[in-house]
Amino acid sequence: MQDELTSEVEDKDVTVRKADLGREIRSLISYAVGCMFGRYSLDVPGLAYAGGAWDASKYKTFIPDEDNVLPICDDEYFEDDIVGRFVKFVEVIYGKETLEENLRFIADALGGKGPSRKIIRNYFINGFYADHLKVYQKRPIYWLFDSGKKNSFKCLIYMHRYQPDTIARIRTDYIHEQQSRYRTAIADLKQRINGASTSEKVKLSKQLTTLQAQADEIRVYEEKIHHLADRMIRIDLDDGVKHNYEIFKDVLAKIK
């Protein structure tokens, strides 16, 4: 990847400078997210979409996410999981043969220990949005729906592709599915605790406490999302990021 990172990127002309490899890799990740949403395309220069009529013919090499919702979870629960999509992006650009090597290169540049996909996932959960806010000077074009400190649910949408039914889609297709997973996992843990040894019970009980806290958090969050989903809110892009973000502030990450 060191030799190839000048690929198709114009946000894109990412040339790796040894002075700050981490910054360049974060720029590549930002560009990849732009491609996932269709803001950028590997097939056309500059902006591919920033509002108006959608032109699917601009996207051949890497197809944008269909519903404009990219879940950011602690595991690959959804088909359009953001880490899974990023891995696919790297594979499309640099090839399958060097995929693992390139993911390792990216993970090492981000810093941290562990498997490359885990490091990349941790960056999306904990670092990506802060970087996005810096780049866009607290006027984010990607919006982070965030349930809270327990990380029970997060997802990104692209503001310019927002539709009145976007919130309802987040609720029914993602939050409800995640709630179901928590219920299943909690029931499973309770069963395992009943038949576990004393030392194993301590470990499983800690996991159960964490899951129950996440389930409580997402239940409260679902109620907030439900309220907004029912309103089918329309936004006007001409009103600007700050005005539109404020409408959804109760369910979006705080801008710091």
Annotate each PLM feature.
Residues 4-256:
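Terminal accessory regions of large proteins
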